[in-house]
Amino acid sequence: MLCHRIAKGFMGHADSRDMLEIEIKAPCKDLVKLEKNLVKLGARDFGTLVQADVYYAHPARDFGKTDEALRVRTENDLTVITYKGPKLDQDSKTREELEVSVANVGTISSILERLGFRPVLKVAKRRKVYGLRGVSVCLDRVDGLGDYVEFEYEGEELEAGKAIIKRLMGDLGVEGNERRSYLELILAQGRN
C-alpha cells in the first residue's frame, strides 16, 4: 500500500477510502532492463526506499490459515502498522488493507507484544518506485529472496484494475504472477 500511496499523490488520485488496491506481483530476472523499459515508456521515478517489515502472529488465531497479516513497516522516519485481510480473488494479491502511521516503532512493538502478539519474521527490501498509466510499479530487491516487480492500481472495479495492470505488464514484457507475500515466500523456503 505504501508504494501506491507514494506515487498516487503525484498521479492525481482522489481520496481512496472506498477504492480497492489491486496488486499483482511477479518475479523479475532483470530489474535493470525492466527499469530501462519503464523509462522508455515515460514512467515517473518516485525514488528508492529501504523498508524493514516485521510480521506478527496473533495470540488466538493462525494468520496463515485465515490469510491475514499484521505488519509493522519502518522506512526512514516513517513507521506504519498495517492489517491485511484475506485475498479477494484467485488471480491477484488484492485484499483489504487498513493502516495507520505511528510515531515510534519501539512503542508500537511493545504494545503488540504486551497484547500477546509475537514477532514472526523480518522482511527487508530495497524498493524503487515508478508511476505509469495510473499504476505504481515497485521494483523490489528482497533480502534472501531476490528480485520482484509489484504492480499496484487503485480503483473501484477489481476486474478493470487487473486488466489495466496486465496490459502494462504485457507492454513491459513481465510474465508470471506470485500471489504469495514475501513473508509466505520466506517461510516456504524454511520448509524446503
Label for each model-derived stretch:
Residues 137-139:
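Short beta-strand/turn micro-motifs at beta-sheet edges
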Residues 16-134, 171-192:
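N-terminal strand-loop-strand beta-hairpin
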Residues 159-176:
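Long, well-ordered alpha-helical scaffolding segments within enzyme catalytic domains
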Residues 84, 142-148:
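Residues forming anionic-ligand binding surfaces in small-molecule and nucleic-acid pockets
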